[in-house]
Amino acid sequence: MEHVISMEEILGPFWELLPPPAPEPEREQPPVTGIVVGSVIDVAAAGHGDGDMMDQQHATEWTFERLLEEEALTTSTPPPVVVVPNSCCSGALNADRPPVMEEAVTMAPAAVSSAVVGDPMEYNAILRRKLEEDLEAFKMWRADSSVVTSDQRSQGSNNHTGGSSIRNNPVQNKLMNGEDPINNNHAQTAGLGVRLATSSSSRDPSPSDEDMDGEVEILGFKMPTEERVRKKESNRESARRSRYRKAAHLKELEDQVAQLKAENSCLLRRIAALNQKYNDANVDNRVLRADMETLRAKVKMGEDSLKRVIEMSSSVPSSMPISAPTPSSDAPVPPPPIRDSIVGYFSATAADDDASVGNGFLRLQAHQEPASMVVGGTLSATEMNRVAAATHCAGAMELIQTAMGSMPPTSASGSTPPPQIMSCWVQMGPYTWTCIRHCGFRDRWEHFICRRR
């Protein structure tokens, strides 16, 4: 059976109410083992019932109280010290708790007589006192281990877990070296308060612990220094400014993109309008080119016609020879040959017209029919009309040529006189007139045919 007794219960008034135990006969006591965990002492006994355990517990507690009273009478009041909880078991849980100030209980080394050693009660008291001294030594060792540098703690983080605490326990080292931890208790208790106060002050929670991510180590808190805090704030401020600059730059780029999109749409509209104008101009250009080619063809045709008329007018003879028919009475009289000239054109046009219609525009000199045309009889009406038309045209051409030949070439001042237009209208039939006009220049003849409807 195991029973757990705390330190507050040991120091409380509970022990004053217990009466001193009655002496009992000596008997074998099982070995008592004490286990220290934080501020709790575990006392276990094996091999006996509940009644024996209670009697043994009362006797042991009474003996321990008597020793404490003797120490209180022989020693002065010790200085206050700070009780630090075990950081290995509850480092992160007890970090926010303030340190508890308690009076340090010092134990004066007492001479253990042979009679006391022989008494099992005294033996139990000695064992309990040794456990208390081991507890204080363990606290001192924890205080010493808390003031090491961060590098040493990072290197030795694995040495404080598992069975490494047994190797680094100073109590066991002292026992192995032959030293008495009881005699060195008072000398070590003097500097315990200062070291514990220093270590506890370094473990006080700080408001900046929330800002430090991942700064908690295995053996305790690694508090940031002022330089690290300042550097962290500077980094945050620079990151904030960088985000502001990026946001402003992104806003400028978005504005530029919107402006470029507007300009692009405007340019696209202008390009569409220009393309439409280009297409219209291209169509108009093709139409104008077709019209120009048509006009060129017409001009060329007019020039060719005028040239042909001029050539025909220049080859007209002064008199048209008419061949006489054969003296056969039965054979019809063949028509006289018509030359390919303007006179022949005029005579062919007026072949079926009435010869009795006169020319009211220009008086022509009457010509008598040559005697060679009337041979062995009279001419037909068609032949007479053709001969009359040819005679009229030939006379008109002779008059125009005579008038043009009598014109002076130049004036008295040496300059060419203005051209004089001379024309001759010849009626070829009841509804047809022809005009031969000369403009005063060499080889510049114009021929017009007018028909009345």
Swiss-Prot record:
Keywords: Activator, DNA-binding, Nucleus, Transcription, Transcription regulation. Interacts with the Dof zinc finger protein PBF. Residues 253-274 are annotated as: Leucine-zipper. This is Regulatory protein opaque-2. Seed endosperm. One of its GO terms (cellular component) is nucleus. Residues 225-288 form the bZIP domain. Residues 224-240 have a biased composition (Basic and acidic residues). Residues 228-251 are annotated as: Basic motif. One of its GO terms (molecular function) is DNA binding. Residues 145-243 are annotated as: Disordered. Residues 146-175 have a biased composition (Polar residues). It comes from Zea mays. Belongs to the bZIP family. Residues 207-216 have a biased composition (Acidic residues). It comes from the Eukaryota. PROSITE patterns: BZIP, BZIP_BASIC. PANTHER family: BASIC LEUCINE ZIPPER 63, REGULATORY PROTEIN OPAQUE-2. Involved in the regulation of the endosperm-specific production of albumin b-32 and other zein proteins. It is a trans-acting transcriptional activator that binds to the consensus sequence 5'-GATGAYRTGR-3'. It is found in: Nucleus.
